[in-house]
Amino acid sequence: MDELDSAILRLLQRDARQTNRAIARTLGIAPSTCLERIRALRARGVITGFHTAIDPAALNRHVQALIHFQIRPLSRSVIEAFKTYAVGLPEVSTVYVVTGGDDMIVHVSAPSVDYLHGFLMDKFTARREVVGFRTSVIYQHTHNQVLPPLTA
């Protein structure tokens, strides 16, 4: 990946709705060059899709939390089955398989703390593979809008 690819990615990460011509104009390159670079980035799997950023509160998701799970027995099939179950729940946005004291972290959102409590009790306490979990309510979050490539 060269500097031109990195510049294209920066612009697309800030606003994926930009036209090819607008990106080319900003970078001072021909639109055909820009289009070919974007196609190549997609073909190489660098660009995996274009997404819309949504305010969770606008979807009645006022409370967000990270649920830290301990799973047993710890096997690929059990982890995969639980991951499939969790990601199928409408309250779940992301499932992470992690190392350390927890086996999985699940990012959820809910209309209220009461709803969150009921969701946890109804969806996870009866699952045999869940030997324990703890909840961290998210007060605020920030993320980088642009992820630049890192050098080794």
Feature locations, PLM:
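A compositional/biophysical signature of low hydrophobicity enriched in polar/charged and small residues
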Residues: 1-152
